């Protein structure tokens, strides 16, 4: 039985008896959790523990894996996203994702950010599209660095700038949730600090769920933390409490470095 504390406020995302199989291998076992609106929730645990699998359930990226099978319920604002009637394109507009390695499109910086709003019809004309692009880059802390380089390719930027461009691209379609799967693992310490500062600035405007192998990063950026082990949610609670007084022996062992 997972140890999960309660929190004040409403849930943006709720999982109930969520199970995931890849072929014959079960990756998640009866996961039950709630993710509060407008906060940063970190998911930690050893490699292969299921945290990224859970993250991919939130925007149904597992639909793209032929052998994946998902059962149970996963709610976004009370609506089960596993329902066959769910519009997955609209879901992924509401739930943006930033991947482990920066993956800018082979297009200009401008087009990287403009692509999503144009696809979803979010801009009435060129002027409004410009406003969305500039606002998104500004929110991602990148506008000042690229405002004179908008015609250059996204791949011409540094690794840290590319990752912030990907965050701007996610922001541009006005998501409610931003998923981040190890967003700093390929970045140097300076670029990592910039992304972490950005996450803190985005908190409140978005519900953010971040998977990280770095417990130090989880402690710095999140308000709540969930610990996964062998496909099971072991413990979830306020980040400060999790790191100072974990309640489950497995959580304590992982945090103190006895395994992982």
UniProtKB/Swiss-Prot annotation:
Q: Give residues annotated as binding ATP.
A: 45-52
**Is Signal a UniProt keyword of this protein?**
no
Report the InterPro entries cross-referenced here: AAA+_ATPase, ABC_transporter-like_ATP-bd, ABC_transporter-like_CS, P-loop_NTPase, PstB-like
Q: What class of enzyme is it?
A: translocase
A Pfam family annotated for this chain is: ABC_tran
Cite the GO molecular-function annotations of the record: ATP binding; ATP hydrolysis activity; ATPase-coupled phosphate ion transmembrane transporter activity
- Substrates-to-products reaction catalysed: phosphate(out) + ATP + H2O = ADP + 2 phosphate(in) + H(+)
List residues of the ABC transporter domain. 13-255
Q: Name one GO biological process term.
A: phosphate ion transmembrane transport
Q: Which PANTHER family does the UniProt entry name for this protein?
A: ABC TRANSPORTER I FAMILY MEMBER 17
Similarity comment: family membership? Belongs to the ABC transporter superfamily. Phosphate importer (TC 3.A.1.7) family.
* Role played: Part of the ABC transporter complex PstSACB involved in phosphate import. Responsible for energy coupling to the transport system.
Question: Whom does it interact with, and what assembly results?
Answer: The complex is composed of two ATP-binding proteins (PstB), two transmembrane proteins (PstC and PstA) and a solute-binding protein (PstS).
Q: What is this protein called?
A: Phosphate import ATP-binding protein PstB 1
Q: Which organism is it from?
A: Paramagnetospirillum magneticum (strain ATCC 700264 / AMB-1)
Q: Which gene encodes it?
A: pstB1
């Amino acid at each position: 039985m997972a140890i999960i504390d309660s929190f004040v406020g409403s849930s943006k995302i709720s999982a109930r008896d969520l199970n995931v199989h890849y072929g014959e291998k079960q990756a998640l076992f009866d996961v039950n959790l709630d993710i509060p609106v407008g906060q940063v929730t970190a998911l930690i645990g050893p490699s292969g523990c299921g945290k990224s699998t859970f993250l991919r359930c939130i925007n149904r990226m597992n639909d793209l894996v032929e052998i994946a099978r998902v059962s149970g319920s996963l709610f976004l604002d009370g609506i089960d996203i596993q329902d066959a009637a769910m519009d997955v394109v609209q879901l992924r507009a509401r739930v943006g994702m930033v991947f482990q390695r920066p993956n800018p499109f082979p297009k200009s910086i401008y087009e990287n950010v403009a692509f999503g709003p144009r696809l979803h019809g979010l801009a009435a004309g060129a002027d409004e599209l410009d406003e969305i692009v500039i606002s998104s880059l500004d929110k991602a802390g990148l506008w000042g660095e690229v405002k004179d380089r908008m015609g250059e390719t996204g791949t011409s930027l540094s690794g840290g700038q590319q990752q912030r461009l990907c965050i701007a691209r996610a922001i541009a379609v006005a998501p409610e949730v931003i998923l981040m799967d190890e967003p700093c693992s390929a970045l140097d310490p300076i670029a990592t600090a910039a992304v972490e500062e950005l996450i803190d600035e985005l908190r409140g405007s978005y519900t953010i769920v971040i998977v990280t192998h770095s417990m130090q990063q989880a402690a710095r950026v999140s308000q709540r933390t969930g610990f996964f082990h062998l496909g099971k949610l072991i413990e979830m609670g306020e980040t400060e409490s999790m790191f100072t007084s974990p309640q489950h022996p497995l959580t304590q062992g992982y945090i103190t470095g006895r395994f992982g």
